[in-house]
Amino acid sequence: MDHLPIFCQLRDRDCLIVGGGDVAERKARLLLDAGARLTVNALAFIPQFTAWADAGMLTLVEGPFDESLLDTCWLAIAATDDDALNQRVSEAAEARRIFCNVVDAPKAASFIMPSIIDRSPLMVAVSSGGTSPVLARLLREKLESLLPLHLGQVAKYAGQLRGRVKQQFATMGERRRFWEKLFVNDRLAQSLANNDQKAITETTEQLINEPLDHRGEVVLVGAGPGDAGLLTLKGLQQIQQADVVVYDRLVSDDIMNLVRRDADRVFVGKRAGYHCVPQEEINQILLREAQKGKRVVRLKGGDPFIFGRGGEELETLCNAGIPFSVVPGITAASGCSAYSGIPLTHRDYAQSVRLITGHLKTGGELDWENLAAEKQTLVFYMGLNQAATIQQKLIEYGMPGEMPVAIVENGTAVTQRVIDGTLTQLGELAQQMNSPSLIIIGRVVGLRDKLNWFSNH
C-alpha cells in the first residue's frame, strides 16, 4: 500500500492553497466544504475567489508565494501552472512537516486527493495512487450510481436511533436485520429528504415495532428497452438490493449481469400466444417470495405499466397486504424510436402518439377509423404476427398506402435491426423480422434517413 487512506478533521484549521485559477478553485471548494479556515495565495484570482472572499469564506493574499503563510497551516495545496513554483511550495511545506498536495504531480506531493463520493456522514474515497485519475473518476461514477442520493440523511438519522434500537432488539442479529431494513426503506429516505416529520415518525415506528420475520416487499422495476445504459439509476439500486429477481425474456443479459450476485433469479419469460409461466402463477411467485420476508424485484422489459401487466401483479399484492412500489422504465416506444432516428412527435407531422398492443384478440376490435387519421404516430407493441391485418385495416379505413412505416427489431441493443417502407409493404416487411419487434407508422418515419444516428455508431 503506497498511501494510507485517512479522513482529516479540518474544521476551523488553517489551510493554504497556492494558485488562483480554475484548478485551485476546485480544490478550494473541497476544503471549504470540510470547514477549513482557508487562505489562498496567488498573483491573480478568478472571480469566484473574489466572491468567496467578499462573503467572508476565505482570505486572499495577492502576490508572490509567501512561505510564512505555511507557518500556522495543517495542510497545503500547490495548484499553479508553474511546476517550479509548485515544487517550491511542496519543499517549504515538507520543511515544516506539513502535508502538501501538488496538482498533477503525485511524486512531488506528500498526499494525494482521491475521487470522493459525498453522502455525509458517509464518505467514500477512490484512489489509483495518482497513477490513473481518470480510472478513479470512472470508478467513482459507478459507485455514485449505486448509492442513493439521500443515504447520508438516513445514516445521520440512524445515529439518532442507535440507543432505542439497542433497547428494542436484544441480539446483534436482530439489530443487524433491523438496520438492513431501515437502510433500504425508500419511504423513510424520501421523508427525510422532504423533512416530513410525520412520515418519518410513522415509518420509524412501523419498522421498529413490526416483527423481524414480517412480510417482505415487491418492487416493480422497468428494465428499459434493452441497452443496459438505459436502466434508470433507481432501477439499478433496486436490483442491487434484491433477494429475489423475477424477470422475463425482454430483460437483456447485460442488465441481469448487474443483479446482486447472491440474489435468487426466477425466469418467467413469455412469448406472444405462448406463456412459459401463466400470469396467475407469476402473481403467486411474487406473493410467495414476499411472504417469506424477502425483498423481491419484478424486473420487466420496458416500462411495467405499458403493456407489461404490472397493474395485475400489483393488484394481487395489494389484496394480500404486501407492500409494493414501482420504478418506471423507458418504454420500448421511446427507446426504439430514439435509437432509430424516428421522433414520435414532430411539429410538422405528428401532434400525438398512440401506443397500441398488437395482440388483436377475437372480439376486441380496435378503433381503426381514428387510428387511420393523419398527424399522429402509431406504435404497435407485439404486432409482428398481426402486421398484415394492421396493414389491411388501416388502408381500409382511409390511411394512405404510401404512409411510411418502420419495424425495429431488438431496439437499442447492439443487434438492433430496422427495416422501413410504406404501409402497403407492412405485411411483407414483417416476414423479414423476428421478435421482439416494434412497428412504427406515421410521417415521422420519413425523417429516419436524416436523423438515424445509432447505425453510424
UniProtKB/Swiss-Prot annotation:
SUPFAM superfamilies assigned to the protein according to its UniProt record, in alphabetical order: NAD(P)-binding Rossmann-fold domains, Siroheme synthase middle domains-like, Tetrapyrrole methylase
Active-site residues per Swiss-Prot or TrEMBL entry: 248, 270
GO molecular function, one term: sirohydrochlorin ferrochelatase activity
GO terms, biological process: cobalamin biosynthetic process; methylation; siroheme biosynthetic process
Residue numbers spanned by region Precorrin-2 dehydrogenase /sirohydrochlorin ferrochelatase: 1-204
Catalyzed reactions: uroporphyrinogen III + 2 S-adenosyl-L-methionine = precorrin-2 + 2 S-adenosyl-L-homocysteine + H(+); precorrin-2 + NAD(+) = sirohydrochlorin + NADH + 2 H(+); siroheme + 2 H(+) = sirohydrochlorin + Fe(2+)
Enzyme Commission identifier(s): 2.1.1.107, 1.3.1.76, 4.99.1.4
Uroporphyrinogen-III C-methyltransferase: annotated segments: 216-457
Residues annotated for S-adenosyl-L-methionine binding in this entry: 225, 301-303, 306, 331-332, 382, 411
Binding site for NAD(+): 22-23, 43-44
Pathway involvement of the protein, from the record: Cofactor biosynthesis; adenosylcobalamin biosynthesis; precorrin-2 from uroporphyrinogen III: step 1/1; Cofactor biosynthesis; adenosylcobalamin biosynthesis; sirohydrochlorin from precorrin-2: step 1/1; Porphyrin-containing compound metabolism; siroheme biosynthesis; precorrin-2 from uroporphyrinogen III: step 1/1; Porphyrin-containing compound metabolism; siroheme biosynthesis; siroheme from sirohydrochlorin: step 1/1
Keyword field: Cobalamin biosynthesis, Lyase, Methyltransferase, Multifunctional enzyme, NAD, Oxidoreductase, Phosphoprotein, Porphyrin biosynthesis, S-adenosyl-L-methionine, Transferase
Residues modified as Phosphoserine: 128
CDD domains assigned to the protein according to its UniProt record, in alphabetical order: SUMT
Pfam families: CysG_dimeriser, NAD_binding_7, Sirohm_synth_M, TP_methylase
UniProt-listed InterPro entries: 4pyrrol_Mease, 4pyrrol_Methylase_sf, 4pyrrole_Mease_sub1, 4pyrrole_Mease_sub2, CobA/CysG_C, NAD(P)-bd_dom_sf, Siro_Cobalamin_biosynth, Sirohaem_synt_dimer_dom_sf
HAMAP family named among the record's database cross-references: Siroheme_synth
Family in the record: In the N-terminal section; belongs to the precorrin-2 dehydrogenase / sirohydrochlorin ferrochelatase family.
Purpose of the protein: Then it catalyzes the NAD-dependent ring dehydrogenation of precorrin-2 to yield sirohydrochlorin. Finally, it catalyzes the ferrochelation of sirohydrochlorin to yield siroheme.
Protein name: Siroheme synthase
Organism: Escherichia coli O127:H6 (strain E2348/69 / EPEC)
Gene that specifies this protein: cysG
